[in-house]
Amino acid sequence: MQASRYAFCVLALLGVASIPASGTDWPRFRGPNGSGIADATGLPADLGDQRNILWKIFLPWGHSSPIISGNHIFLTAAEGGEETDAGREKVVDAGGQLVTFAIDRGNGEILWKKAAPRPRMERYEKTNSPASPSPVTDDENVYVFFGDFGLISYTVEGDERWRLPLGPFNNVNGHGSSPILVDDKVILVCDSDTAPYMLAVDKNTGKVIWKTDRPETTRSYVTPAVFQPKDGPLEVIVPSAYFLASYSADTGEKLWWVNGGGWQTKSTPIIHGDMIYSNSWEGGGQIPADGIPTFTEAIKKADKNGDGVMNEQELKIVEPKRKLYLIDLDHDKLVDQRDWEFHRIRRTSKSSLMAVRHGGRGNLTETDHLVWSLEKFLPNVPSPLIYDNVLYLIKDGGILSTLDPQTGEIFKQGRLRKALDKYYASPVGADDKVYMISHRAQGRRSVGDTDFPRLRGGGLRHARHRRESPVYSDSQYALLSGPTDKSIEARASS
């Protein structure tokens, strides 16, 4: 392992000195239904304090967030490999194992560690890792996903129950989507630049119940949320590149959608009453649609050899400033109609935070179900948070925005002092506080609605490069930091 790959990172539990087990506390990425909200009380005002440490252990690197079930903490990591350059700011984790850890919540003891098969080693973006998807649990079993293998289920005691190989995937940045549990199904979004899909797997057998192709999208890194309407089937809400959609949890049928958003979606949707909020950052330049030729027009102008596609030299005739690899989705070194149509959509796409009222079917883009949208001040990776009827957005540079979730009106906006950093971790609301952790682990908390003067900050000593979202449970607070070596601390509240 190269020494440059290591840094000291921290996961902390803050709470009572005696840590009780209490069922499923934080069962999936972003907690209950991805909300980022916990019922915890007695949490600290500042995150940088080093007092009251109960235990600390060290773990290998990875970007998955921990989950909590009873007396167990589960998380995944990559162990023993070596990052090698794969070109174009992509890397491959060569030779390492993909592992799942179970940790005793009370004393930090590693209860078990299991390695997954690794039939391939797909490349990923340097800020990602091969162990980014977070586990999910139903208290009795835990389910994990690795892009280099697929899905695996273990009992909470570490016995393997089943495995389902998936892939390979064509996702140049690696994976970021975590599995969720819906009734008796494990649901997973497998978006990529070719053949994207979503599937539901029987949580008891690992058999595929349904699989829904998603040809209208490309790569994304989202974890869904679940919406239960008053009437009708349970719905799985899935943000995507270029649209937000709902699917029947029972059948995988696409029920409704709203077009719009950026071309790389990373945030988890938020359900608040009958409203759904979806953030999609990274627009393509907002070029007018008529400013980019259709495929027919491009071929007529550029296809000099008459084969019906464009090679690298021909592409320069119609897109002299665009690299072939950015348009060629299937990596065959040619631009066909699918490649070009998604290129046009990408170039015209806009970052967007959409607020959608549930209740329709089919295409809701031009209906009053799209209540409001915002195209500025949006996060790249962090998910929105709605806490105490205030919508929080934290983006790179420490720019914090608070909004009225009903109207989209901005209450207040400003930069967090001493936290002008990149933000990958999503904010979490608990105990009348909102916690935000930056890339370099500059901890911040806000108390009370939009009152910025009551923000406090504190660096998490020895913690660097935080990308996982905080985890809260009962009167405890858990924080995981990566992407390199992780350490775990348990603390008592003061």
Q: Could you describe each region identified by the protein language model?
A:
Residues L13, R491-S493:
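Short, linear, compositionally biased motifs with a strong N-terminal bias
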Residues A7-S18:
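Bacterial N-terminal signal peptides
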Residues M1-Y6:
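N-terminal secretory signal peptides that target proteins for export/translocation
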